[in-house]
Design a protein with these regions (language model features):
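Hydrophobic anchor at the beta1->P-loop junction of P-loop NTPases
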Residues: 26
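Walker A/P-loop
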Residues: 35
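Short beta-strand-centered segment that lines the nucleotide-binding/catalytic pocket of NTP-utilizing
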Residues: 46-61
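ATP-dependent NMP and nucleoside kinases share a basic, alpha-helical "lid"
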Residues: 115-122, 127-160
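Small-molecule kinase domains that catalyze NTP-dependent phosphoryl transfer to phosphate-bearing small molecules
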Residues: 115, 142-143, 163-217
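Extreme N-terminal, non-catalytic leader segments
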Residues: 1-22
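ATP-dependent small-molecule kinase phosphotransfer cores
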Residues: 57-124
Length: 218
């Protein structure tokens, strides 16, 4: 991976479209069930790429680690000749400092998107799904042919965040308040709302319905 120009989306969406691929972003608020949806789509046999796994891939690149550490002013950890982000220190910093959070995101979000789209371009199959938590906040909507918005009742999604991340409900609500408001947003005619208000089999059926709609419209 390049260690410079990380903020540039290097033509990967165009490459994917030219090769006949249909790119679908899977998004939604915190705790909505995006990762669960991605797991189900993978079980259907479709190529899927997540922001978290892409970020972990980037963390193996010393140049990326140095760039991020320098951007937020947190010294990287060096171990056995490799550089590692001090993720705990950075997490504590950006949770309380909105300016530091924006600095971090100005580096990490474009890099994650570029790497994810490169991976999607190289994937087998003509229908590829990418989990993009900050699709609208980051201005990435136009990079995808279709969007799945996963929606879940607030009580259930905040409970999921408390259980998953060890945060309080108040912290979960605070994070949600900073994100795009999906509650009354259904998107454009190539946006499919997937209601996650039941069990896994119900979510699976709704995802199948969304896929059938994509196949008809693409």
């Amino acid at each position: 991976m390049r260690n410079n120009g990380i903020g540039v989306l290097a033509g990967s969406p165009e490459k994917a479209r030219k090769s006949g691929k249909t790119l679908v972003a899977v998004t939604g608020g915190i705790g909505s069930g995006k990762s669960t949806a991605i797991g189900i789509l993978s079980s259907f046999g479709y190529p899927v790429f997540g922001a978290d796994e892409t970020y972990r891939e980037l963390l193996t690149d010393d140049g990326f680690v140095s760039l991020v550490s320098g951007k937020v002013g947190v010294k990287p950890i060096e171990r056995d000749g490799k550089l590692f982000l001090d993720r705990k220190a950075i997490a504590e910093l950006v949770f309380y400092d909105e300016k530091a959070k924006k600095k971090l995101e100005s580096v990490t979000h474009p890099a994650i998107m570029e790497k994810m789209l490169q991976n999607a371009s190289a994937a087998k199959g003509d229908l590829v799904f990418c989990e993009v938590p900050l699709l609208y906040e980051g201005g990435y909507r136009d990079l995808f042919d279709f969007v799945f918005i996963v929606k879940r009742p607030d009580r259930a999604r905040f409970a999921a965040v408390v259980s998953r991340d060890g945060r309080t409900e108040e912290q979960a609500r605070e994070i949600a308040s900073r994100q795009f408001d999906y509650s009354a947003y259904d998107g454009d005619d190539r946006t499919i709302v997937v209601e996650n208000d039941g069990d896994i089999p119900q979510l699976s059926e709704r995802l199948k319905e969304g896929i059938e709609r994509i196949k008809k419209e693409k």
